Amino acid sequence: MFKKIMKGANRKASKAEANDSSMYGFDPPGRSGPGSNMIVNHASRGSLVPSSPNSMAAATTQPPPMYSVEPLPLFRDVSVSERQSLFLRKLQICCFQFDFTDTLKNAREKEIKRQTLLELVDFIQSGAGKLTEVCQEEMVKMISVNIFRCLPPASHENTGQEPADLEEEEPYLEPSWPHLQLIYELLLRYIVPSDTDTKVAKRYIDHSFVLRLLELFETEDPREREYLKTILHRIYGKFMVHRPFIRKAMNHIFYRFIYETERHSGIGELLEILGSIINGFALPMKEEHKLFLIRALIPLHKPKPIAMYHQQLSYCIVQFVEKDYKLADTVIRGLLKFWPVTNCTKEVLFLGELEEVLEATQTVEFQRCMVPLFQQIARCLSSSNFQVAERALFLWNNEHVVGLIAQNRGVILPIIFASLEKNIESHWNQAVHGLSANIKRMFMEMDPELFEECQQQYEEKQAKSKQVEEQRQNRWRRLDEAVEEREREDPMITS
């Protein structure tokens, strides 16, 4: 009786497996073949219902599923009428996936797939024939099968150790890159041409596809991130319907990076895309874009690994100020809010970015924030780290910045005068000493009366500080004398 029950259960299981489309890498389903070493993943998207009689007719000409990887004829060796069908068959071959951790395993099949991918790229690039909707759909499915995958964990996730400095880590290089690169090339050749009908293509390059592309930016392989950057930028430019969605999805990636993980390999590439997007913003700037600056871009100065993406971030920030100069006050106050306290390397980056922002700042906006700004610059000028002090002093090499300072010297010089004097008197670095003396001389020539007034105030303040210090020392001396006298009067106190 038990054996009969088990046989029945096995029959049901085999039927369920036969009907389960998730076991196959393409649609219509076909098994991966006799080799157990081949891996076939299910496409990321389901089949779409054909939307026209033409597409219905094309759907009936789909080739039967393939069960093994065998070479197919070249496109030039078949008639024009057979090329669409051959294209679909080649797509089926490319849905097979292999284990690249062992270079010898399935070497023949891997090479067949690579050659097939090359043929597909050449076919799309040559424009030899306009792809039917079925061909476009199946091609996007094949691309999805290959590129959308679980990324390997970072080294610290494997070991459970604290993450090391991202700049010092060796990036993980994707073993299947010989195939992946060609698939990305195919996707790029499909998106870029001007004759690609976006009304048709957006059915397959949809929000789900774009979102999964964005998830791939976490890959450690810089080659893949470079392709992803180019492709996403092209999608943003070509598919206007996706633009708000892409910006919103990027927002979420930045929020998670800032407030949760502080780890993401592709922040620099995403910011590079954003730099181009910001450059194309129309004026007057929408409130949505200003909120993005305040809520996402400025807080990106907070994470520790800012050095990995600071160049791209700085470009985006400056683009905003150049687009709308009234944002300068907001940006400068944002920088001051996230100004590093103990990280000198990060402080040097901030000073460099600050100079670029000031170069695009007008007088009115500068006056709104100059007091807190130069209070921070004064702290940088007197920093014991010579790189920080030197970078702050280099601000006076910028003509536009010097012009802003000259117009407002009555407010600025009293704030920074003490830092300049202390550098000249006691800073250990000769370069800092010399630069401080040059700036002091510049102010002296610019406004002798103001300089004399600041000099007098500084000397009075120093004299007062010296007097306070002497009084403090006298109090301690009198206290010591009182203790000694008490000890002499009552020896029991010390015994």
From Swiss-Prot:
Coiled coil: none
Cellular-component GO terms for this entry: cytoplasm; nucleus; protein phosphatase type 2A complex
Transmembrane regions: none
Superkingdom of the source species: Eukaryota
Record field: compositional bias (Basic residues): 1-13
Region spans: Disordered: 1-61, 462-495
GO biological process, one term: megasporogenesis
InterPro entries tied to this protein: ARM-like, ARM-type_fold, PP2A_B56
Entry keywords, A to Z: Brassinosteroid signaling pathway, Cytoplasm, Nucleus
Bias kind Polar residues: ranges: 49-61
Keyword Chloroplast recorded: no
Annotated compartments: Nucleus; Cytoplasm
Family matches, as Pfam families: B56 (PF01603)
Tissue expression summary: Expressed ubiquitously, higher levels in leaves.
Main location class: nucleus
Molecular function terms, GO-annotated: protein phosphatase regulator activity
Family: Belongs to the phosphatase 2A regulatory subunit B56 family.
Assembly with partners or alone: PP2A consists of a common heteromeric enzyme, composed of a catalytic subunit (subunits C), a constant regulatory subunit (subunit A), and a variety of regulatory subunits such as subunits B (the R2/B/PR55/B55, R3/B''/PR72/PR130/PR59 and R5/B'/B56 families). Interacts with BZR1. Interacts with BRI1. Interacts with SRK2E/OST1.
Protein role: The B regulatory subunit may modulate substrate selectivity and catalytic activity, and may also direct the localization of the catalytic enzyme to a particular subcellular compartment. Required for the formation of the PP2A holoenzyme that positively regulates brassinosteroid signaling by dephosphorylating and activating BZR1.
This protein's name: Serine/threonine protein phosphatase 2A 57 kDa regulatory subunit B' alpha isoform
Organism expressing this protein natively: Arabidopsis thaliana (Mouse-ear cress)
